[in-house]
A protein has these predicted regions:
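Alpha-helical assembly-interface signal, strongest on the long, hydrophobic N-terminal helix that forms
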Residues: 1-33
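Long, compositionally biased low-complexity segments
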Residues: 24-606
Length: 606
């Protein structure tokens, strides 16, 4: 009884502010020896009490001491879950069933997988357009060759041999550029083929996270890249022939120049006879050169390539470029600035405590409950639950762990953008009208000059950028206190393709979105991110903030000096009451009639 009472008394000295502010129990201590001393002081009154069995306390030893920061964050999770299960029995919160939690996890994982796969293929769209630009470079070079050839012909008509030779040399310079331009095209085509093969393998790895219907739509869009590469293979055979043809033409032009030099030298050296009756017929002299020059087989690229409306294609790239930079200035409401505060991480548990960076072993519902605890006890961008500690965006720090509020809010905007882009892509793939609209715009961009599969490649790019532009609107609405459905419908979709191009042109949205009465707000999406990312890292960042907060009133407070469990062993000496050696004491020696017993007890907050 005395041991149990002593350990209960010891554990009752939990840190009051830790409990009042965060509903966590922790017995603050300095050293293990101090805990042993305190336990002894609680135990001794029970031993000193008058009873039939007088006892003396010989020693006290702690056998186990478990801190809140121990066991890779599991202790913290256990206390949080204990409070959330029994401390909120009469409080309404957005609880999901195990099945609903699993469905949420599958939906978000699918969105992430679709976004990752689409991002790779969107990159291939840019690479395909780059390949088309390689062909455009070859075409420009050949057009310049033709222009110089035509000008050379005019020089011959004017019987200007020196000017013709200069033009001929310019034709040669253009022809000499062709092999390197063709080789660059071949290298880009080869690289694109290899990257597509790698992306196909990447898709196979992600396929298990993508549902059948969305996978079918995605594979249909991905197939156009294979068709493009196949058709480009046919073009490559034609383009490769330009290397040999340009070399042959160089020799042809060089031979013509040599003939022209001979004619020009003859003309320059010709002198009329003394009586001046013989005249030089220059036209007749130049006739063979002119005839040969007219027969020059000037080169053309001979294949379909490029895009007709480059401006619209550039606008799509500008949207991607704009949204790949700093997001906060674009999504924060007008007049609102991000906090520049930085949490006090000196001696932070996440820095000091060695741990395994891995997902928590908590069940899906337990992960949701831990996330709900964080939402209820820590500040975030959209709501202050309590006076701020050393940073304003505590939930965001728990999620991402950067050293300052602004960096964590920037990462929050990026994660929300990525999540929404994936969900928006799923909607586009599921909506035949939007896919058709993307193909129509792609057809307008490619026009009649490019190969047909390029239209599908550009359409995939358009769908990805469209989903990104809509995600930008979504994140801006969330930062402004609005709600966005996790899964969109045609009615809840905001951004038209016309406004998407306008976004690329102006760098801002020209339309105001419809206010949504249903869906998830910033808090709701924060709950999803906490659910997805919860692990030992988030556990320790929770402890970072608790420690930082409590240090404002108690500078030396340390989470790793808050015990969750204390086990003690006491060595107690008792004396026999009804037995004494009496006169035989000297015969048996010391005459010590006591005995020693070890007692163990454990104190824990769970």
């Amino acid at each position: 009884h005395g041991m149990n009472a002593a350990i209960d008394s010891l554990m009752s000295q939990y840190h009051r502010q830790l409990w009042e502010q965060y509903r966590l129990f922790g017995l603050e201590y300095g050293t293990g020896q101090e805990l042993e001393q305190e336990f002894s002081e609680f135990l001794e009154p029970y031993l000193e009490a008058e009873n039939w069995y007088p006892m003396d306390l010989k020693k006290v030893e702690k056998t186990e001491l478990v801190s809140l920061t121990d066991r890779n964050g599991q202790i913290l999770e256990d206390q949080i879950l204990d409070y959330m299960r029994y401390g909120l029995l009469n409080v309404r919160w957005e609880e999901l069933s195990e099945e609903e939690a699993g469905e949420l996890l599958r939906s978000v994982r699918e969105a992430a997988a679709v976004e990752e796969v689409a991002e790779q293929y969107e990159g291939h769209s840019g690479e395909a357009l780059k390949l088309e630009k390689c062909l455009e470079s070859i075409d420009r070079c050949l057009n310049q060759q033709k222009q110089q050839w035509e000008e050379g012909g005019k020089m011959l008509e004017d019987l200007n041999g020196d000017a013709f030779i200069r033009r001929g040399q310019q034709v040669i310079r253009q022809l000499e550029r062709v092999p390197s331009l063709v080789e660059r095209y071949e290298e880009e085509a080869e690289a694109l083929g290899e990257k597509l093969a790698a992306s196909r393998n990447f898709y196979k790895q992600k396929r298990s996270d993508i549902s059948g219907q969305i996978a079918s739509c995605l594979e249909e869009e991905m197939a156009v890249y294979e068709t493009y590469i196949s058709r480009d293979g046919e073009r490559r055979k034609e383009v490769e022939g330009l290397k040999e043809a340009s070399s042959n033409n160089c020799q042809y032009v060089q031979n013509t120049i040599e003939e022209a030099r001979e004619v020009q030298e003859f003309i320059d050296q010709w002198e009329p006879d003394e009586d001046g009756e013989e005249e030089l017929d220059e036209e007749e002299l130049w006739e063979p050169v002119i005839r040969k020059w007219d027969q020059y087989p000037h080169l053309t690229i001979g294949v379909r390539f490029g895009v007709e409306d480059q401006e619209k294609g550039d606008l799509l790239e500008q949207v991607k470029t704009m949204l790949s930079g700093k997001l906060l200035p674009l999504v924060l409401p007008e007049g609102r600035q991000a906090s520049g505060r930085r949490p006090d991480l000196s001696g932070a548990p996440s820095v000091l405590i060695s741990r395994d960076e891995k997902q928590s072993a908590a069940s899906l519902l337990e992960r949701l409950m831990i996330g709900e605890y964080i939402l209820r006890f820590f500040n975030r961008y959209d709501e202050k639950r309590k006076d701020p500690g050393s940073c304003d965006y505590e939930m965001e720090y728990i999620l991402f762990g950067y050293g300052g509020d602004q960096e964590n809010l920037e990462e929050m905007a990026l994660r929300l953008l990525t999540l929404r882009q994936g969900m928006n892509l799923i909607h586009i793939f599921s909506d035949s009208q939007k896919r058709e609209a993307a193909r129509n715009l792609a057809a307008a961009i490619v026009g009649g000059i490019g190969i047909l599969p390029l239209t599908g490649v550009v359409a995939f790019l358009i769908m990805g950028v469209w989903a990104l532009g809509e995600a930008f609107w979504d994140v801006r609405a969330l930062f402004d206190g609005g709600k966005i459905p996790l899964v969109k419908t045609r009615d809840s979709w905001q951004l038209s393709l016309e406004n998407l191009l306008d976004l690329g042109k102006k760098g801002a949205l020209s339309q105001e979105g419809k206010a949504e009465s249903s869906g998830l707000d910033y808090r709701g999406y924060g709950r999803i991110l906490l659910f997805l990312t919860h692990g030992s890292g988030t556990d320790y960042r929770v402890m970072d903030l608790i420690q930082s907060d409590l240090r404002q009133k108690q500078e030396e407070f340390r989470m790793d000096r808050c015990a969750h469990q204390v086990d003690m062993k006491a060595g107690i000496c008792g004396k026999h009451v009804f037995f004494s050696l009496g006169l035989w004491k000297s015969f048996f020696g010391s005459g010590d009639t006591g005995y020693e017993l070890d007692f163990e007890v454990s104190g824990s907050y769970l």
